[in-house]
């Protein structure tokens, strides 16, 4: 029996169709991977099934009494709450039951109280609390918080002071503690370190309820799912098995369709040739008409146009001085120092990856080196002739510009055709280029920012988690481009598969604090 069913769903933004008459079902206990290229509509689908967005057409039907939890990285956390306070809200229902028990005991003390009936209700509530391990909740909260790295930044920390990555960890921990019938997870590993990803993988493998997962971390995705829904060309197609099995079946179906297309095209050409040669001759006119009828009744096989794949190419600028950045007793932070005094040297043509737990100051270090924020103590010496290109991890939402406008405003000397060509090289279609940036997916928005970076000459690239939100093709192409780039790279990255093999040096931020 389906616990979630989507029927005849159609949706779009303006004249850009996202889904066209698609259906979807989720059965109890299924572990579904929702896969597809950037911009195909995966996050939009999640927003529709959770009711955050209304579809243009179609129905979303949930079974009665089913609970669902959605990892929404834009959720608002109440001010003046500690991390522990937020995690304890996962059990609000149980705390209400405890309060009700206390009220019932108060009622028993009143004259004329039906003690037997009140005790029966107390017993039912007590059974519910014990079945949910209510009296060991704090231990359970600590277990999940430790496993996801939440304890690294403190359970008593005010949530309003958290970084984006820390905030996402808290939301994920709260969601897992709630243990709903259906988990809806959109890129849950984006801000997790390797050890936390391993724990989440084991957790999801053993999760007895259902979940729908979006992730561009293919090894992680493959290890936890048993059903794939592929989003492509406004359609949703269901496949049984893990991601690698889906790839095999998809490639085989694509190959079979292409072979059938080629055979049909040859048959069409032969039929048209026969009709053209024989329709005018009396002796063969009937045969020509028969062939024409066959042509007219033929169901034409259509191949979907290939999705544009990005082609990244970062232009080097003139050669800088030997030293890019040198720090002297640098301490970074906002109110309190996040690091011990740092004496770092970053030289010309080095390619360095900065790794370490989320929320401990890697982004703050980049911004301090660039002069975006002032250090608490010490100094940063920047080299001569620097042409810096900076890719930020987080950008503010609500950008009503189109990619065409954003790039053209940044490079007014280009004509419209050149701007469109530059965006197309980053894997964006005409529909993407003419849509507002705020309605694009995270991966598409990243491609717009890469386009801005590519059209400047830089001799230093400073990149903060550049692979977040990128699909497999875009990530592979970015890796190739950075490997071939003839300049210096300083990059924060949590994905060893991305940087291993071409990075010269690793700065482990855990050793700098």
Located regions from the model:
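ABC ATP-binding cassette signature C-motif
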Residues: 1-259, 308, 317-513
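Intracellular alpha-helical coupling/juxtamembrane segments of multi-pass membrane proteins
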Residues: 249-304
């Amino acid at each position: 029996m389906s616990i979630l069913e989507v029927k005849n769903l159609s949706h779009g933004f303006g004249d850009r169709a996202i889904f066209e008459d698609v259906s979807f079902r989720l059965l109890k206990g299924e572990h579904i991977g929702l896969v597809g290229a950037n911009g195909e509509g995966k996050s939009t689908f999640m927003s529709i099934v959770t009711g955050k967005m209304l579809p243009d057409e179609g129905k979303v039907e949930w079974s009665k009494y089913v609970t669902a939890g959605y990892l929404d990285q834009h959720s608002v956390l109440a001010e003046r709450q500690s991390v522990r306070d937020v995690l304890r809200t996962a059990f609000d229902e149980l705390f209400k039951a405890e309060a009700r028990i206390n009220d019932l005991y108060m009622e028993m003390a009143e004259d004329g109280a039906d003690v037997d009936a009140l005790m029966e209700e107390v017993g039912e509530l007590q059974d519910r609390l014990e079945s949910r391990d209510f009296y060991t909740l704090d231990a359970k909260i600590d277990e999940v918080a430790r496993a996801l790295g939440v304890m690294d930044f403190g359970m008593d920390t005010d949530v309003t002071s958290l970084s984006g990555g820390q905030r996402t960890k808290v939301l994920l921990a709260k969601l897992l503690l709630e243990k709903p019938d259906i988990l809806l997870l959109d890129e849950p590993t984006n801000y997790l370190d390797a050890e936390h990803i391993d724990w989440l993988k084991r957790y999801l493998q053993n999760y007895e309820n259902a979940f729908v997962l979006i992730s561009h971390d293919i090894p992680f995705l493959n290890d936890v799912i048993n059903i794939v829904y592929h989003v492509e060309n406004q359609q949703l197609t269901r496949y049984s098995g893990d991601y690698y099995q889906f790839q095999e079946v998809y490639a085989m179906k694509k190959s079979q369709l292409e072979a059938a297309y080629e055979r049909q095209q040859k048959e069409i050409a032969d039929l048209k040739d026969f009709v053209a040669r024989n329709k005018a001759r009396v002796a063969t006119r009937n045969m020509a008409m028969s062939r024409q009828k066959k042509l007219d009744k033929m169901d034409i096989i259509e191949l979907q146009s290939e999705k544009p794949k990005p082609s990244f190419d970062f232009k080097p600028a003139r050669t800088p001085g030997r030293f890019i950045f040198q720090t002297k007793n640098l301490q970074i932070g906002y109110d309190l120092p996040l690091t011990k005094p740092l004496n770092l040297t970053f030289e010309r043509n080095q390619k360095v990856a900065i790794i370490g737990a989320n929320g401990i100051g890697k982004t703050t270090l980049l911004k301090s080196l660039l002069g975006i924020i002032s250090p608490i103590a010490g100094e940063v010496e920047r080299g001569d002739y620097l042409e810096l290109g900076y890719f930020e991890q987080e950008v503010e939402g609500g950008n009503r510009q189109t990619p065409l406008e954003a790039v053209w405003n940044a490079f007014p000397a280009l004509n419209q055709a050149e701007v469109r060509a530059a965006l197309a090289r980053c894997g964006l279609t005409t529909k993407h280029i003419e849509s507002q940036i705020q309605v694009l997916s995270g991966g598409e928005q990243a491609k717009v920012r890469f386009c801005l970076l590519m059209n400047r000459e830089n001799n230093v690239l400073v990149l903060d988690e550049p692979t977040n939100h990128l699909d497999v093709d875009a990530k592979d192409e970015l890796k190739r481009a950075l490997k071939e780039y003839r300049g210096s790279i300083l990059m924060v990255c949590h994905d060893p598969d991305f940087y291993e093999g071409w990075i010269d040096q690793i700065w482990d931020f855990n050793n700098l604090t």
